Amino acid sequence: MGKVKVERSEDADESVVASGDVTIKEEESYDDKLIFVNAIAKPMAGKKLAKKCYKLVKKAMKHKTFLRNGLKDVQTRLRKGETGICIFAGDVTPVDIMCHLPAVCEEKGIPYTYTPSRADLGAAMGVKRGTVALLVRQNEEYKDLYDEVKEELSALNIPV
């Protein structure tokens, strides 16, 4: 199942349930989002780990310099030596724009993971637009959650 979004629409299709003039469209499940994931999106965060990552992003968003988003910003921050946790979107096309970032993270010893949807990463930040890459730095206010996510990411098998 999932969350239910309410949209105003004239016509309805199979995935939309109509009730009067308001149609209710159900959000895609985690498994449905995995269909659109690229071949290089490994290690993929499980459902629970993805939820923890989104929660961490929400907490980091409250502090201005502790969350870096966007391909260009994350790329420059990694090159300049910032550390933290990298979260990448798995449904990016074309793949060539970000396929080098996992190698950079491995060189620098930064844990990283992929989540199924870039729209969900954007929603966790509180914006309507999706994002391709995030770099979350450690802060005292969410240290426990940060350490928990970092420990789970280091337990994931990084493909060679």
UniProtKB/Swiss-Prot annotation:
UniProt-listed SUPFAM superfamilies: L30e-like
Q: Lineage of the source organism?
A: Eukaryota, Metazoa, Ecdysozoa, Arthropoda, Hexapoda
Q: List Phosphothreonine occurrences by residue.
A: 23
Residues modified as Phosphoserine are 15
Q: Name one Pfam family in it.
A: Ribosomal_L7Ae
Q: Does the keyword Repeat apply?
A: no
Any single GO molecular-function term of the entry would be:
box H/ACA snoRNA binding
Official protein name in the record: H/ACA ribonucleoprotein complex subunit 2
Please describe the quaternary structure of this protein.
Component of the box H/ACA small nucleolar ribonucleoprotein (H/ACA snoRNP) complex consisting of Nop60B, Gar1, NPH2 and Nop10, and associated with H/ACA-type snoRNAs.
Any idea what job this protein has? Component of the box H/ACA small nucleolar ribonucleoprotein (H/ACA snoRNP) complex, which catalyzes pseudouridylation of rRNA. This involves the isomerization of uridine such that the ribose is subsequently attached to C5, instead of the normal N1. Pseudouridine ('psi') residues may serve to stabilize the conformation of rRNAs. Required for ribosome biogenesis. H/ACA snoRNP complex-dependent ribosome biogenesis is important in female germline cell differentiation during oogenesis.
Q: Which Gene3D superfamilies match?
A: 3.30.1330.30
InterPro entries on file: eL8/uL1-like, Ribosomal_eL30-like_sf, Ribosomal_eL8/eL30/eS12/Gad45, Ribosomal_eL8/Nhp2
Q: Which UniProt keywords apply?
A: Nucleus, Phosphoprotein, Ribonucleoprotein, Ribosome biogenesis, RNA-binding, rRNA processing
The protein's location, in the record's own words, is: Nucleus, Nucleolus
| GO CC aspect terms | box H/ACA snoRNP complex; nucleolus; sno(s)RNA-containing ribonucleoprotein complex
The biological process GO terms on file are: germarium-derived cystoblast division; rRNA pseudouridine synthesis; snRNA pseudouridine synthesis
What family name appears in the similarity comment?
Belongs to the eukaryotic ribosomal protein eL8 family.
